[in-house]
Amino acid sequence: MMSSSSPTQLASLRDMGIYEPFQQIVGWGNVFKSDINDHSPNTATSSIIQVDPRIDDHNNNIKINYDSSHNQIEAEQPSSNDNQDDDGRIHDKMKRRLAQNREAARKSRLRKKAYVQQLEESRLKLSQLEQELEKVKQQGHLGPSGSINTGIASFEMEYSHWLQEQSRRVSELRTALQSHISDIELKMLVESCLNHYANLFQMKSDAAKADVFYLISGMWRTSTERFFQWIGGFRPSELLNVVMPYLQPLTDQQILEVRNLQQSSQQAEDALSQGIDKLQQSLAESIVIDAVIESTHYPTHMAAAIENLQALEGFVNQADHLRQQTLQQMAKILTTRQSARGLLALGEYLHRLRALSSLWAARPQEPT
């Protein structure tokens, strides 16, 4: 009896593509056994099976497919070098991200610092405005009839705007000098600053008509500014001493002209100061009333006193005229850039005087 793996079955297995070589060996063994038992040469001869060449081709195809699949799997698996490259790229990306975070944090700290400084400046300005408002409330700028002096109230509003504009112009000068703009552009800024001071002198002239004592007493200025005040403003000679260190180098001709300007300014200051002293003396004499003649000469003496007070307005205007002339003469003596540096120094000086007053007012008070 034949084994279960007959030639017909082998052929069907080959057609299905699941032929097993071990099954072929088993089949051959059964055939040889049948030949020995039957002792029939015809049977033995007919039992020899010719191997189909397609079997070898099929086996070769299986081996080739296996090798190619194995090679493909190996190719798909990343090598150690690729892993190292990926790790390096990830590490570089993390370093860049950390650097970006540090830079963002640094910029955030700078913005916070600038914001805190701005708040502090605003606090100082608010404190100064509160002090000025309180001073206005206490004095009221009242005239003899108790009405508000509109001329002085208008001057205080205009002067507040003038200070804001002054701060902006000083900042423009600083930026222009740092950026090295052309002399033509810089000259326009210098002339604009000089005109800005001229506007202040005109404002003061109008205020002097409303109340010269308010103006000459310095009630419109801070406490530190009043400490340096001379006839309603700064001394021209003081101005020259402040800006001189920022004008170097000067030519010999410039040095000579600046010295002459200092000398003439000092002489004009002395003349105005002497005039103020004589005015005070004359005013005091005009109101000294002898008890014997009080009833008959009182109106005459008071009229003379009023005339003397009216002359005080002229002294304030002359002092402002001297200040304006000193600024203009300095601009003529100096180059454009020297003038810009001088105006910048003057603006910073006046600004720091006002800031010093605010700091003094905001200082901690010792308990009494």
Swiss-Prot record:
**InterPro entries in the record:** bZIP (IPR004827), bZIP_sf (IPR046347), TGA_domain (IPR025422)
Q: Which residues form the bZIP domain?
A: 91-151
GO molecular-function terms, A-Z: DNA-binding transcription factor activity; transcription cis-regulatory region binding
Q: Does the record carry Nucleus as a key word?
A: yes
Q: Which Pfam families match?
A: bZIP_1 (PF00170), DOG1 (PF14144)
- The lineage's top-level taxon is Eukaryota
Listed transmembrane segments: none
The answer to keyword Transcription regulation applying to this record is: yes
Q: Which UniProt keywords apply?
A: Activator, Coiled coil, DNA-binding, Nucleus, Transcription, Transcription regulation
Q: Where in the cell is it found?
A: Nucleus
- Principal localization reads nucleus
- Cite the residue spans of the region called Leucine-zipper: 119-133
**Ranges of residues in domain DOG1:** 152-363
Subunit arrangement?
Answer: Binds DNA as a dimer. Interacts with NPR1 and NPR4. Interacts with GRXC7/ROXY1.
Q: Which family does it belong to?
A: Belongs to the bZIP family.
**What is the name of this protein?**
Transcription factor TGA7
Its encoding gene is what? TGA7
